[in-house]
Amino acid sequence: MSGELDAGVAKASLAAAQQVLDVQLSAEGADAGKTGEDLFAVTSLLDSSVGLRRALTDPSRSGAAKAEFVRRTLSGRITPAALETVVALASARWAAGRDLSDATERLAVVAVVTQAERSGHLDALEDELFRFARTVAGSPALRDALADRTAPDANRASLAARLLLGKASPETVQLARRAASSSRGMRAERLLEEWVEVVAKRREQLVAHVVSATPLTDAQRERLAATLSRQYGRAIRVNLDVDPHLVGGLRVSVGDDVIDGSISTRLDEARRRLAG
């Protein structure tokens, strides 16, 4: 995830692969934490092999051929969820090999965040990652120790784990270890700050922004939250704003989804039809 993903091809490919990951992790018995660890391992494998990156991003090879190569190489070595995610990544189009590595790392973080969500640690994960990033940034000695590439990766990972022992969730420790041991050209504190944004995005997806013409009662908010939770398959928190201009009805936004049932919108649509 070091560096920005290409805004065009890479962004679309990442989004498609994340859908595959989400579906895989929704399966009964799927281990999101282990899947994240496996995807981090694949990221390291891609980073260490220019030939592998080129093979999986070669536009002259079909997506099916690249998918078969991934299955032949990694089947049985990583979780089924990680395997299908890497297959989706390899089958997609990429502008550069680095984009593939960045996307794989991003989805590794998403998998760990998913595990934190399931464990009820999502809020703690965001806070703990942020605080640890600030601790590292504020300590030149610690910052230099975690940036020392002459030290073995395992030693830097162990240092991060010791600092968080008994003070943080397992998912925080997992991500801190990875950030500390990463050799991807970005300091640990900067990686952690990027990953805080991934957690924040996941938390944002769990919030329904509701605009109503009049205030909702507590009972109405609870019913709305329950309905949305059933629809999205996860707990939804309702944030309510009041806008009398809506006249009646609700406008609900959850992530990129917008459900507009306001009377003002219906009236506007009716006017457009009449004018057309």
UniProtKB/Swiss-Prot annotation:
Protein's UniProt name: ATP synthase subunit delta
Family: Belongs to the ATPase delta chain family.
Top-level taxon of origin: Bacteria
HAMAP family: ATP_synth_delta_bact (MF_01416)
Stated role: F(1)F(0) ATP synthase produces ATP from ADP in the presence of a proton or sodium gradient. F-type ATPases consist of two structural domains, F(1) containing the extramembraneous catalytic core and F(0) containing the membrane proton channel, linked together by a central stalk and a peripheral stalk. During catalysis, ATP synthesis in the catalytic domain of F(1) is coupled via a rotary mechanism of the central stalk subunits to proton translocation.
Entry membrane topology: Peripheral membrane protein
Gene encoding the protein: atpH
InterPro entries: ATPase_OSCP/dsu
Main location: membrane
NCBIfam families in alphabetical order: ATP_synt_delta, PRK13430.1
